Swiss-Prot record:
Source organism per UniProt: Haemophilus influenzae (strain PittGG)
GO annotation terms (biological process): carbohydrate metabolic process; D-glycero-D-manno-heptose 7-phosphate biosynthetic process
Domain of life: Bacteria
Residues that coordinate or bind substrate: 52-54, 65, 93-94, 119-121, 124, 172
Gene3D superfamilies given in the database record: Glucose-6-phosphate isomerase like protein, domain 1
Catalytic EC class: isomerase
E.C. designation(s): 5.3.1.28
Family affiliation: Belongs to the SIS family. GmhA subfamily.
Cofactor binding: number and manner: Binds 1 zinc ion per subunit.
Keyword set, alphabetical order: Carbohydrate metabolism, Cytoplasm, Isomerase, Metal-binding, Zinc
Name of protein: Phosphoheptose isomerase
Amino acid sequence: MYLDQIKAELVEAQDVLNKFISDENNIKLIQEAALLISNSFKQGGKVLSCGNGGSHCDAMHFAEELTGRYRENRPGYPAIAISDASHLSCVSNDFGYEYVFSRYVEAVGQKGDVLFGLSTSGNSKNILNAIEAAKAKGMKVIAMTGKDGGKMAGLADVEIRVPHFRYADRIQEIHIKVIHILMMLIEFEMAKQA
């Protein structure tokens, strides 16, 4: 009934992953992002992560694996997903949804921290505002984007871009794969310090 559609979906997902892998720069950027985060942790910094919709879930997933665990039992790493419901509703109501992440960065971000922002389009105004706030605080910025990077292109210290122009789900599939690789590398790097 749906076997051909199922196979087509899996083949397309594989094609997007293969295209991403074929650009050696993407591999280097993942390493750069992992080292940037690890160095922040080693110097007492933390990660603030944010995104919208499915990317919001990915931001929470990343923070959870940093504070909890990925593959190894080890000390938790300092990370906060900007996902507190009362903060999100307060700022959305009082200032506008475009400020939900930047207000949080202004409140708790510090020099040496890392903002980890996800936007499949690269055009999310609230992520763009968070990047601006992070830079004003002396934070480093890692952006995970898709398509052509949108307005976020060139704004981050490290941008990991999935060059897929159709649906956001394919971009998100690569984002979560990258998040898991980042976790693995961060655990490797932080274990050197222990």
